[in-house]
From Swiss-Prot:
Entry superkingdom: Eukaryota
The name this protein goes by in its record: Periviscerokinin-1
Matches recorded under Pfam families: Periviscerokin
GO CC aspect terms: extracellular region
Length: 11
């Protein structure tokens, strides 16, 4: 998931 508060680490 490249969007949101953390655009990295998570899908």
């Amino acid at each position: 998931g490249s969007t949101g508060l953390i655009p990295f680490g998570r899908p």
